[in-house]
Amino acid sequence: MSSEDDVIRVRLPDRKKGELFGVVTSMLGAGHIKVRCEDGVERLARIPGKMRKKIWIREGDVVIVVPWSFQKDRADIVWRYTNPQVEWLERKGYLKF
């Protein structure tokens, strides 16, 4: 099987819930990171406790964020993509930033 025939399951942002793609730009420590979102806004994002020790996030990772409803320059991380998933998203045209 070629790499194009491989089946990859990829979670996409739920636009009804306000989820956006983002790229990690810097690590700030204490479970906080800077994320450049697909709408062009740089947000201070929080890594929730359920993800802290299970999923390690580094600079350059593609993530899904949910902006806070009362403070638009802040967000929560809900998902981190692996490298094969990012390649698939780029090939299919989902990542445009």
UniProtKB/Swiss-Prot annotation:
Keywords: Initiation factor, Protein biosynthesis. Residues 8-82 form the S1-like domain. GO terms for molecular function: RNA binding; translation initiation factor activity. Seems to be required for maximal rate of protein biosynthesis. Enhances ribosome dissociation into subunits and stabilizes the binding of the initiator Met-tRNA(I) to 40 S ribosomal subunits. HAMAP family: aIF_1A. Belongs to the eIF-1A family. This is Translation initiation factor 1A. It comes from Archaeoglobus fulgidus (strain ATCC 49558 / DSM 4304 / JCM 9628 / NBRC 100126 / VC-16). The gene is eIF1A.
